[in-house]
Amino acid sequence: MIGLIFGETDFPKYIHKKLKTKKKYTIVDLTRGHVFKKDRNSYSFSIGQFGKIISILKKKKCKKVLFAGKVHKPNFSKIKFDLKGLYYIPRIIKKAKLGDAALLKEIINILKKEKIQTISSTSFTPELTLTKGNYYTHRPDKKDQSEIKTALKHLKRSNQYSHVQGAISRNNHVTLEKKGGTQKMLKMS
């Protein structure tokens, strides 16, 4: 049995359609409109009901979970928490201030402590991933390769706690993705 923790966007719908007949699953629906409520294996929760989410995953014997879709950052002062949610909330708020990557890592660590493994969504959707290589007709020239090396050097310099996920390098000026997200990085470059 696999636990599917779904948020907004079309990606969860794609995974659901693909797994519907192939695997036994339980859906944790974190969407605002409860998109998956018609599925009999779906359970709707708010983000603060962490204890209920973990207990339903354990009750349904889900040893693995998969995250897909976007969950909007909540206003933590307006959320109703259960006991486990209250226990974990200080850590979650602290990581949420660092950015989405830090928050997701913290949730994965919490699930790991509860003996629930997180798996990649690409394990069920390999057709959506690209293999290593150039997918554009333009080959990088020496200047492009130099810019790529500069960006990689800056990415490698960032530590695991900075949660940098991307870099843009132009004319030896490097812009790193920080907690503002990818869109902010693209605007700054």
Model-identified regions with their sequence ranges:
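N-terminal basic/disordered segments at the start of proteins
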Residues: 1-30
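Conserved mixed alpha/beta catalytic, RNA-binding, or beta-rich assembly cores of soluble enzyme
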Residues: 8-11, 44-47, 97-101, 107, ...
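N-terminal beta-loop-helix "entrance" segment that forms/cooperates
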Residues: 29-51
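Short, high-confidence coil segments that cap the C-terminus of an alpha-helix
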Residues: 62-63
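Short glycine-rich anion-binding loops that position phosphate/pyrophosphate groups of nucleotides
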Residues: 70-73
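A charged helix-plus-loop insertion that forms the helical arch/lid used to bind
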Residues: 77-97
